[in-house]
């Protein structure tokens, strides 16, 4: 009986040729009758099936892939080397020597830093071996990647004849500032940097302006500038900065800087209009429109109430704190009126008694204006501070503390009222013009959330 584990033919098949011819069909039938699997591979590439004729028992044989002569076949292909072909055959000592002596242009030896990292080096060990600090290593590697992206004709379309501009020692610092932009923006920003001979600090300002321009949509004057022009993006960033300046001279200076770079005619006209208003105010002249009314462009920038930004730990360090009920802007006036009022306070033990239960509370420092209105004060939570009637630069939540006992509208005040089911903040002057004599509450103070002193990405990269 034939065993599947034995690849050799039956002994009877090796005696004589005639006997082999008579027993061969039986041998095939025996082999097929004892197979339970659907197919079995035989030595030499043959196979048999559980059903069908002899032609169905053989599967097509595909030889395994063969490696080139002298090379081991490896199904896994490692990622391509970051080194150019001219540097791939260098040993470790030669690579370190090139970095140590800064041999060649910076973008030629910058890939060696990445290759050393793959070989197990860290920034500290590379600095010890080559003298290149970790910050400079990061700058060289990132700048090299930015430079390579400029060479991509499909995405960047950057003229190759302009690339030698960045071959100088200051080239890595300039290209490093473009790391947050996409390939198209990098090409446009690089052309602008070359045209205006910008230093790294100026390129950083340009890159941040181009990155932030889409997020500033909806702000006053935004539609007059073009997003496709790096100069217009930079001009609008300076135009926007001028509207946040407190001193009128600082405002004029920012607008003059914006006028130096603005490219489109609509953007230039908008900057010139704002610059004329600022210069009139600096000269002490009142700007009057055709109907004889005072221009409120500058006045609209002033809040009219105290606006404070909390510091981290300020509540914990405060001598006294005040607990106030909180309502959302979508809750409406009914919820604001139903918020609890303070009934009794134990100053010694800090126990506060209110007239009803409430779910959301805010703890703020015991500022004087808030303490005076604490009995009837309520906190209105706004999801976006840019909805306030004055100009705010950041999209951030704010807390509006209002006194419900003061509802009469005066032109100098700021008030909370309901419009289309939402709580909004409006100036008293605007409400008086609309004939509104009473509001839901008068704004006492506006609280902005804590913020780091420098909210941008650190200019230095740590090891």
From Swiss-Prot:
GO biological process: ribulose bisphosphate carboxylase complex assembly
Subcellular location: Plastid, Chloroplast
Chain intervals with Basic residues compositional bias: 19-33
UniProt feature coiled coil, ranges: 240-294
Transit peptide: 1-31
Region span, Disordered: 1-84
Pfam families from the UniProt entry: Raf1_HTH (PF18579), Raf1_N (PF18578), RuBisCo_chap_C (PF18087)
Tissue expression per record: Expressed in bundle sheath.
InterPro entries, sorted: RAF1 (IPR037494), Raf1_C (IPR040858), Raf1_HTH (IPR040781), Raf1_N (IPR041358)
Biased composition (Low complexity): 1-18
Keywords tagged on the record: Chaperone, Chloroplast, Coiled coil, Plastid, Transit peptide
Region (N-terminal alpha-helix): 83-275
Record has Transferase as a keyword: no
UniProt biased composition (Gly residues): 43-53
Recorded GO CC terms: chloroplast
UniProt region (C-terminal beta sheet), positions on chain: 305-450
Top-level division of the source organism's lineage: Eukaryota
Phenotype when the gene is knocked out: Seedling lethal due to a lack of RuBisCO.
Domain free text: Has 3 domains, the N-terminal alpha-helical domain, an extended flexible linker and the C-terminal beta-sheet domain. The N-terminal alpha-helical domain stabilizes RbcL dimers and RbcL dimer-dimer interactions, facilitating RbcL(8) formation. The C-terminal beta-sheet domain probably dimerizes Raf1. The 2 C-terminal beta-sheet domains are swapped and pack against each other to form the dimer interface.
Subunit structure: Homotrimer.
UniProt record similarity statement: Belongs to the RAF family.
Function, in words: Required for assembly or stability of RuBisCO. Acts at a postchaperonin step to fold and/or assemble the large subunit (LS) into RuBisCO.
Name of the featured protein: Rubisco accumulation factor 1, chloroplastic
